[in-house]
Amino acid sequence: MNTAHLFPWFILLNPLIAAVLILFATRKNHGVSATISVLSAFFGLAAALCAWTLPEVHSSVMWLDFGKALQVPLGVKLDHLAKTMLLVVTGIGFLVHLYSTVYMEHDESKARFFGHLSLFMFSMLGIVLADNFAMMFIFWEDRKSVV
């Protein structure tokens, strides 16, 4: 069974899962939020590096279907441009995460910061992997609400 079409979804959903974990797992222990977020960014960078070995992937599911009048798929596209931008976004994102662990070390709202940072990474990766303008617009607007 070929699972290459699931790989872009893993890259996209990785920071979202990290943000949810930070939301629920760090109510008592705020120090673990940085670890979860940095590990998520590291796995995203490692996955972006591994994506170069994959062929071009296009995977989508129908999101909105109003017959022939309007059909909006929800999908990801992993081509050479997306692979390049994945390296840029995950590489810079990982460095930001590393810097933030030291910068936010004594801050009381560290868990909230790393949760928002993971959501921001999710939005940026969504823009990179979007296969249509509707999906790109959704992730662009989500990015502005996180910041």
Short names for language-model regions:
Residues M1-W9, V20-G115:
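Transmembrane helix-loop-helix hairpins at membrane boundaries of multipass inner-membrane proteins
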Residues L13, L39-F42, G91, L119, ...:
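Hydrophobic residues within alpha-helical transmembrane segments
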Residues I17-A19, L119-M124:
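Hydrophobic, membrane-inserted alpha-helices
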Residues A130-D131:
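Helix-breaking motifs and short loop linkers at transmembrane-helix boundaries and internal kinks
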Residues M135-M136:
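Short hydrophobic/alpha-helical segments at membrane-entry points of transmembrane helices
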Residues V146-V147:
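Conserved small/polar residues in nucleotide/adenosyl-binding loops
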